[in-house]
Regions:
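Short acidic/polar hinge/loop motifs at secondary-structure boundaries
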Residues: 223-254, 272-273, 365, 592, ...
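Extracytoplasmic beta-strand/coil segments of soluble accessory domains associated
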Residues: 152-155, 160-164, 177-227
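Gram-negative outer-membrane beta-barrel transporters
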Residues: 448-452, 512, 516, 614-625, ...
Length: 797
């Protein structure tokens, strides 16, 4: 039976909080029905409605405010069916506000309540970009351009123009040559490779050659991918375990403006979500040239009061190389989940194993002189093997005006990697091949809580949380090798690295057209290094404090303006914090600063003024106290001088009609060292201009496909800018047809015009047999794959 509670109008925020708490306790399982004081003057009216999420599911626990005048409001809560109601309230024009943590606040102005009648006002709330929630369907995010009204996109949700989401549909429409290509759906993000396919990719964003992930933080299904203090390179981010068909959505944010983002996020952070359930079981078989074969089997079913998802991927590919990659991997995902966006629990297990040979970057002079071909290897015994096993759990609970989220994870990780970048420079007899070995167990825990408050008559969404991570690395080794046989051990370290963080953030509606987001973050690290070179053993416990501030103006005609500023950081290899001597020569060395400050600022605009069309523009600046740059001699990244980057990004997405979408992104940056050195101030490998454009077709008659263009601009390869890489372009094609409702075929063509360009270029010294002992400085490149074809047949049961 519906219950009614009589109460007086709320005049102050404190009284509103007290009455809200009392009402929440009384109406836990029933819809809220609010009556005015019996003495309130006529005329009166009633209001009722249902609140749902953008997947049409009822949202319980939503705070519904009926604002009669400034500082005068009635409050109700939705029940388990998402219903709310107000009875016998003053008639006339009112304002309605719907608020719940994890979803964008919806405000409706000038709602007319006619005397003696009941007005219905339903509402749909949309997930905020920070809500990595438990979902039960394929889509975490709708295609934003397809939503009913322009206000239903990121206007009113995002805190910067370079915050965004990528939908599952957008991921599905893209051809993926390798798993990490999914990340190229983020505007301005590029992916390449300088070695074998099983190795972590090269990433580029905001003027950075990020190597394997130095300044972009990546998570998949809530579990971090970046590896600090890694055998091959700081922040190593291997995403070969990613299965594109399971992606439910991607959230991205760029710049150091977000309190919940810590290490490696100075340039940006990308969170890839996985589905909890599939609409139907699928079997997808793919074949292509160069020995490409792939099978994917996935499905979900009801189990033990929840949903059980399972997926298995089998993969093999040789690539266009004279010495075949022979990359073989097996990849499995299992997930059990229960609940919904507001209250849910999920456990996910991921298991990945890969083994491969690799053709590393090769000297340009060796190709020019006819010693080797573009797809030949200097050392055909290079390669690697890796595994990643992870188990994680996520729990989320939403109460009245609050939301709590808890996550825990454990990762068992291993890598054996053999590379030879300098040929015969260090060892003219045996060659310069070296092995990098990494064995670690990663454990982590994080929790956060959000509150909806009213402070001095202003709506406030507050968030606080902490994060804890430990990397126990019993083996962190560097060996000199020949044909993968160990000749000598250079480094054999045991490192325990622990990091903890506390953060807080508040989003305050300062004025009707002004929102302020204030955040602070504190990080504390502990490095414990036990080295085979005793002088390099030791401990260090550094910390860093990072304030953030964003201002959002608008919306004005479905347009918002953003001002963002903040500080962040990236960590350096923990062994640098205790380093005192060179492990080979024992010559004295200076310790490396373990935590490097980043300072950033941004001005941006977002507009959805035209139906179906979204555009964002940002001008940004980012300073680093120390740059991480690639070292050809060491084959990894090393700390260097302080730097500054300035640039702009322009991203556009247009849903032309129900079957055609267009997108185009353009980014440019200028990167320079800010500390003087006579060798020059250009940052080697720093990306300048990038662009991408595409069209996607999804016709009801059964045809679907996409055509995509990518431009990778030239880059300085040496500090004085005397040697530069050439620009490259690539066009990829996808074409498919639905033979039946459950069966479709797809053809992907990569490098459609068979461009002979480089995936990456470096400039450093190497030595081929017969050359001077001090070597030859030269461009070293890894070519883009030749034109290749992949066909797939997919069936949904």
């Amino acid at each position: 039976m519906r219950r009614a509670i009589e109460w007086r109008r709320v005049q102050t925020p404190l009284r509103g909080v007290l009455l809200t708490g009392a009402l929440a306790a009384a109406l836990l399982l029933a819809p809220s029905t609010v009556r005015s004081d019996p003495a309130a003057p006529a005329p009166v009216a009633s209001l009722t409605g249902v609140v749902r999420d953008d997947g049409s599911k009822a949202l319980p626990g939503v705070t519904v405010e009926l604002r009669l005048a400034p500082g005068v409001a009635l409050t109700a809560f939705t029940d388990t069916a998402g219903r709310y109601s107000f009875v016998n309230v003053p008639a006339g024009g009112v304002e309605l506000a719907f608020r719940v943590p994890g979803f964008a606040t919806l405000v409706r102005k000038n709602v007319l309540l006619s005397a003696g009648t009941t007005t219905a006002s339903d509402a749909t709330l949309h997930l905020t970009t920070s809500a990595d929630v438990v979902v039960t369907g394929k889509r975490t995010f709708h295609n934003l351009a397809d939503l009913d009204t322009p206000v239903d996109d990121l206007i009113g949700i995002a805190s910067a123009s370079t915050v965004g989401v990528v939908t599952a549909q957008q991921v599905d429409e893209r051809e993926t040559h390798r798993p990490a290509d999914v990340l190229e759906s983020v505007p301005g993000f590029l992916v390449s490779q300088h070695s074998g396919e099983g190795k972590a990719n090269q990433y580029y964003l905001r003027g950075f050659n990020l190597d394997h992930g130095t300044d972009v933080a990546t998570t998949v299904a809530g579990v971090p991918v970046n590896m600090p203090t890694h055998a091959h390179g700081q922040g190593y981010s291997d995403s070969n375990f990613l299965i594109p068909e399971l992606v439910s959505g991607i959230q991205y944010k760029k710049g150091p403006y977000y309190a919940d983002e810590g290490d490696f996020s100075a340039a940006g952070a990308v969170n890839v979500n996985y589905v909890n359930a599939l609409d139907a079981p699928i079997a997808d078989l793919s074949l292509g040239n160069d020995g490409y074969r792939r099978g994917l089997f996935a499905g979900s079913t009801a189990f033990a009061g929840g949903t059980l998802l399972g997926a298995l991927e089998l993969y093999r590919n040789d690539g266009p190389w004279t010495s075949p990659d022979d990359y073989r991997k097996i990849n499995g995902v299992g997930r059990w989940s229960t609940g919904d966006q507001a209250n849910g629990f999920s456990v996910i297990a991921v298991a990945y194993q890969g083994v491969w040979n690799s053709t590393d970057q090769i000297p340009q002079r060796a190709v020019d002189e006819g010693l080797i071909g573009r797809f030949d290897a200097v050392d055909p015994t290079d390669g690697g093997r890796s595994h990643r096993y992870s188990l994680s759990a996520q729990w989320e609970s939403t109460g009245y005006n609050s939301q709590t989220r808890v996550e825990a994870y454990v990762i068992d990780y291993a890598l054996d990697l053999w590379n030879d970048f300098t040929c015969f420079l260090r060892d003219p007899v045996h060659g310069d091949q070296f092995a990098q070995v990494d064995r670690r167990v990663v454990t982590g825990f994080q929790a956060s809580r959000q509150w909806l408050l009213t402070l001095f008559g202003r709506d406030v969404e507050a968030r606080a949380g902490f994060q804890l991570r430990n990397d126990n690395i019993p083996t962190l080794a560097l060996d000199d090798t020949k044909a993968r046989d160990v000749l000598s051990t250079v480094i054999d370290d045991h490192v325990s690295q622990t990091s903890g963080a506390l953060y807080g953030q508040a989003s305050i509606q300062v004025a009707p057209k002004l929102r302020a987001i204030v955040g602070v973050r504190g990080d504390l690290y502990h490095f414990d290094v036990q080295s085979n070179v005793p002088e390099n053993s030791g401990r260090d416990t550094p910390g860093i404090f990072s304030p953030k501030l964003s201002l959002v103006f608008g919306p004005f005609s479905n347009t918002e303006l953003y001002l963002n500023g903040g500080t962040g950081f990236h960590s350096n290899d923990g062994r640098g914090a205790t380093l005192t001597v060179d492990p080979t020569t024992l010559e004295p060395l200076e310790k490396v600063k373990p935590l490097v400050r980043a300072k950033g600022a941004e001005v941006g605009v977002r507009s959805t003024n035209l139906r179906g069309f979204q555009t964002t523009l940002a001008v940004w600046l980012l300073d680093l106290d120390s740059e991480l740059v690639f070292s050809g001699d060491a084959g990894d990244t090393e700390p260097s001088r302080a730097s500054r980057r300035v640039g702009f990004e322009w991203a556009n997405y247009w849903s032309v009609n129900r079957w055609l979408t267009l997108d185009a992104d353009l980014a440019y940056s200028r990167a320079r060292f800010t500390q003087y050195d006579p060798v020059g101030d250009h940052i080697p490998g720093a990306i300048e201009g990038v662009a991408s454009a595409g069209l996607s077709v999804n016709d009801r008659s059964g045809f679907f496909g996409s055509l995509r263009y990518r431009y990778f601009g030239p880059r300085a390869l040496i500090e004085d800018n005397s040697v530069r890489s050439t620009a490259s372009t690539e066009v990829n094609l996808r074409a498919g047809y639905r033979l039946t409702k459950d069966l479709h075929v797809t053809l992907d063509v990569f490098n459609l015009f068979n461009q002979q360009s480089s995936d990456i270029d470096y400039y450093y010294t190497s030595r081929l047999p017969g050359e001077p002992l001090d070597g030859v400085a030269d461009v070293h490149f890894h070519p883009v794959d030749k034109r290749s074809f992949r066909g797939s047949l997919a069936y949904s049961f």
